[in-house]
């Protein structure tokens, strides 16, 4: 059955100027936006993101790749899955590929989305060609953070009756580096604002269960790990652990960049993605290559 293509507004207030009205595929419980042709690259957003987080990539890479950016389950126009776990998220990524008519794809993940990419590569290795892992980590709590305390801190605003729209600007400015433009911030705030509170809550409950350190060596897909030199959420040290544990990885550290590399320096990020995925034309693995 062909995918239904509908036009929907991605964002309403408070930042309708930055709403992205475009072709969005809605197939069953999953929604995604796609652009371009070529080898498929699936973009997986972070905890406070949505498919709109990837607009610079959807526009900047569409001449080389079929770019697919989803709303993860419980976010945007995608219905929740219960329980929300890394296993059910990975299975949802595989279901997205099925519904998009894709056998094997590159996965590009930011932060929480990078964790999704890792779990998908472990759970559905035959579906994954190459990985781009930006501002992410191989495990929660590498700095000793207590999961219960972290959840309580992240949920305090929602427990007090605030919405994602209420907290979006403060959260994003606290994690971004100085290179984030006003327009890029507005786009990210608008995307965060459309996250349902229930979806954000479920994601916060899920995230501390992430730990794939002992299984990284089982991932055969070549990986590009991108870290921000100013990232305090997932510091460079986390990316080094990740790159060291993978079979075939290279690590790039972007000086002066915080936790939102895909939005802070989109042209640089797109160039890295274009070069790395381009080396895997035909969706076949390549030999190891390191860049520190």
Predicted segments, located by residue:
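Gly/Ala-rich beta-loop-alpha elbow adjacent to hydrolase catalytic centers
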Residues: 109, 113, 117
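Acidic catalytic loop of the alpha/beta-hydrolase fold
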Residues: 229-234
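Catalytic active-site module of serine/aspartate enzymes centered on a nucleophile-bearing elbow/loop
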Residues: 249-292
């Amino acid at each position: 059955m062909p995918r239904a293509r509908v036009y929907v507004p991605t964002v309403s207030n408070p930042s309708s100027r930055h709403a992205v009205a475009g072709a969005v595929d809605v197939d069953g419980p999953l929604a995604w936006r796609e652009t371009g042709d070529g080898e498929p690259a699936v973009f997986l957003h972070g905890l406070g993101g949505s498919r709109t987080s990837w607009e610079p990539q959807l526009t900047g890479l569409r001449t080389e790749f079929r770019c697919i950016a989803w709303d993860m389950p419980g976010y945007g126009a995608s219905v929740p899955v219960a329980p929300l776990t890394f296993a059910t998220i990975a299975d949802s990524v595989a279901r997205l590929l099925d519904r998009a008519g894709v056998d094997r794809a590159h996965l590009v993940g930011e932060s929480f989305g990078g964790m999704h990419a890792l779990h998908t590569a472990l759970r559905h290795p035959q579906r994954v060609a190459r990985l781009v892992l930006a501002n992410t980590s191989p495990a929660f709590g590498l700095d000793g953070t207590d999961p219960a305390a972290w959840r309580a801190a992240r949920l305090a605003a929602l427990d007090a009756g605030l919405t994602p729209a209420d907290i979006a600007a403060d959260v994003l400015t606290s994690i971004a580096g100085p290179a984030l433009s006003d327009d890029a911030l507005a786009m990210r705030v608008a995307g965060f604002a459309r996250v349902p509170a229930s979806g954000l809550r479920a994601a916060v409950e899920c995230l501390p269960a992430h730990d794939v350190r002992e299984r990284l060596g089982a991932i055969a897909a070549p990986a590009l790990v991108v870290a921000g030199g100013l990232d305090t959420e997932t510091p460079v040290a986390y990316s080094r652990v990740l790159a060291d544990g993978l079979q075939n990885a290279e690590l790039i550290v972007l000086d002066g960049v915080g936790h939102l590399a895909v939005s802070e320096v989109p042209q640089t990020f797109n160039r890295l993605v274009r070069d790395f995925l381009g080396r895997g034309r035909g969706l076949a693995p390549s030999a190891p290559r390191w860049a520190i």
